[in-house]
Amino acid sequence: MSHTAEIPMVPGSESPLELKPLKAVDPKAVYHRRAQRLLSLAKDSPLADYFELCRRVVAIQARLAAEADFGQLLAWGKDEAIPLSHLGSEADSYWQGLLQQLLSDLLPQVGEDLARVLRLLMQQSPEQLTSWGASLRQGHMSAVPARFSLFIWAAMGVYWSHWAPMVIKRIDQRKVAQQNLCPICGSHPVASVIVDQPRAGLRYLHCSLCESEWHYIRAHCTSCGQDKGTTLWSFDDTQAQVRIESCDECHGYTKMMFVEKSPLMDVVADDLATLMLDSELNAKGFGATTVNPLLLAHETEQ
């Protein structure tokens, strides 16, 4: 029978000399792996149809990441905090172009009900899309019609993830302080990723928009930063591949993906596949402090 187990936590002593504050990823590889993982997880999921829709969206993201025109990297200062958080109208033009390509590719692959949604989104004005995109990036999910959010975020993700590695190469990582939002684009993390390189047990937060990863000390709440009152929870066994860290101070939680135990894991897909953990923590009075780009369409409109 399934159960939730509380796991004792031992704070680690990590030296910044042994790690990179920021890790860039190859978006093409990330999207390809995510699509494969969604295909695998769908086989045993009650959300198989939704997993398949997400897989198709992510597969298109992979193609766009490899083939699309992204223009030139927009101007930003090397000492600028969160450099990709306030790009101008030129960025809006490019990601909206990516959105049109994504919708055009997806349209022949879906049923008529969803096709009507896609066609309606394709007809929106650039000004409306700009407003919705800004609302999503600022965390105001209810300001955007839920049926459109998944696709808008997917297009923005392709654009921001293309430029993030180039920005990471150019900034002075020694100036990157520990923070709960992405140091590159300012978005929320999807979850924590526990890695075994450069040494076992290091934690990185994975960005929900630009796919960058940034180091965050273990046993500190990833939302409020407190190092007291954090608890690690597991489902079924204390060595599970996916666990949850909760905070008694802010009553938030974030999932932790132990990728060294399962190299095929993808932070977005496996977060989607473990919604039962969210239900367990919600029942205990905790709320998620993270964002999954494949769950944005499920945000409640107000």
UniProtKB/Swiss-Prot annotation:
GO terms for cellular component: cytosol. NCBIfam families: FdhE. Its main location: cytoplasm. GO terms for molecular function: ferric iron binding. It holds the Pfam family FdhE_N. GO terms for biological process: protein maturation. Necessary for formate dehydrogenase activity. It comes from the Bacteria. This is Protein FdhE homolog. Keywords: Cytoplasm. Belongs to the FdhE family.
